[in-house]
A protein has these predicted regions:
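Active-site-proximal cap/loop segments of hydrolase catalytic domains
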Residues: 6, 12-22, 28-223
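Short beta-strand element of the alpha/beta-hydrolase
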Residues: 1-2
Length: 223
């Protein structure tokens, strides 16, 4: 998730633990705008959602390959919320690097954040959006995965709660429509009553089973 001020550290992460348990190496990158590294680092990601932040993630993958941690023929990108956005954008910015992409409760249309969702509902939220993604329509479109779906070169899995207030269900539907229009392969899982992430136990079981099956299909079983 993110972007501003969040960070990955040595803490329990359900998805990371699940994937590691299934034999997959998990790489979590503290990209620019992550917390705990000072104001300059925090602000370095402003207006860079679809560019420099994605390059930080891509550079992390290149490092993992160079260090022999990752098999370059078996890499998939997964993320939730902003991570869902990044899952789509990294495949666009680094064609050929990934074999599949999974977006969970993701943001796929930046301009829509000014129209739908709870962030735009108060002045602080609107100020946040202007600071981190800007207001220029051309820039927003140029950095929105749903406007660049024709550049996605891997199978996609989209997962979303239909009552999500932070990243509204309309975000996922926009991405799905864009993939349809571009004739790109994807799988879909949405659940009514779920918000920004799944909380119902049965839905989570289905989610993780689908995630595992998708990974096994496209990059093989874990070690």
């Amino acid at each position: 998730g993110g972007t501003v001020g969040v960070q990955d550290d040595w803490f329990y992460d359900t998805a990371a633990q699940f994937l590691a348990n299934r034999g997959y190496l998990v790489l979590q990158v503290n990209y620019r705008s992550s917390g705990g590294r000072g104001a300059d680092f925090l602000e370095a990601g402003y207006l860079k959602w679809g560019t420099r932040i994605q390059q930080d993630l891509i550079d992390g993958v290149k490092w993992a390959i160079a260090e022999k941690y990752a098999d370059p023929q078996r890499i998939c990108v997964y993320g939730g919320s902003f991570g869902g956005y990044s899952a789509m954008m990294t495949t666009i910015r680094a064609p050929g690097m990934f074999k599949c992409a999974v977006g969970y409760a993701g943001i796929y249309d930046l301009a829509m954040m000014y129209k739908k969702g709870d962030i735009k509902s108060n002045e602080s939220g609107r100020s946040y959006l202007k600071t981190v993604i800007g207001k220029d329509d051309a820039d927003l479109a140029a950095n929105s995965p749903d406007k660049l779906a024709d550049k996605i070169d891997v199978p996609v899995l989209l997962i979303h709660g239909e009552d999500d207030k932070r990243a509204p269900f309309a975000q996922a539907k926009a991405m799905r429509a864009a993939l349809d229009a571009a004739h790109k392969p994807y799988e879909w899982l949405s659940k009514p009553g779920e918000g920004h992430g799944f909380y119902d136990e049965k839905n989570n079981i289905e989610f993780y089973n689908r995630l595992q099956a998708f990974l096994e299909k496209h990059i093989g079983k874990g070690a």
